[in-house]
Swiss-Prot record:
Name of the protein described by the UniProt record: D-aminoacyl-tRNA deacylase
Lineage: Eukaryota, Fungi, Dikarya, Ascomycota, Saccharomycotina
GO CC annotation terms, alphabetical: cytoplasm
Subunit details: Homodimer.
A biological process from GO: D-tyrosine catabolic process
Record's subcellular location: Cytoplasm
Gene, per the UniProt record: DTD1
Amino acid sequence: MRIVIQKVSQAMVKVDNEIVSQIAKGYMLLVGISTEDTIADAQKLSNKVLNLRLFETGDQFWKHSIQDVQGEILSVSQFTLMARTKKGNKPDFHKAQKGEHAQELYNQFLDLLKTTLGADKVKDGQFGAMMSCSLTNEGPVTIILDSTE
């Protein structure tokens, strides 16, 4: 499982030019699920997302987690994070988990976040849809998490 986590002051997802989710201060997550991922990977990375200290107090950086600041999370499934580009110029997506299985694990990941942060604090896009994402990245702070590391 791979996640790109971005600290944001606001983020929004649209499908067919309609807003489906939006948040204020918090994280925008892009979540890729591989064919090898299990619930253990979802547990590991949900714990990391919830406890990673990316927020500051005054001039003291890296002091507070998303829980500490009562921030929100906007999560978007993104199979393209599993792309391999070693050969040629066309991305290879064979390592990306297929539809139904990916959606099941993705939903379990969201449930883990909601259990700790609260269902009202965790939003997501529309699984499998073509989405338009917009955000204001603060810092900018962008970190890549990988359950194999």
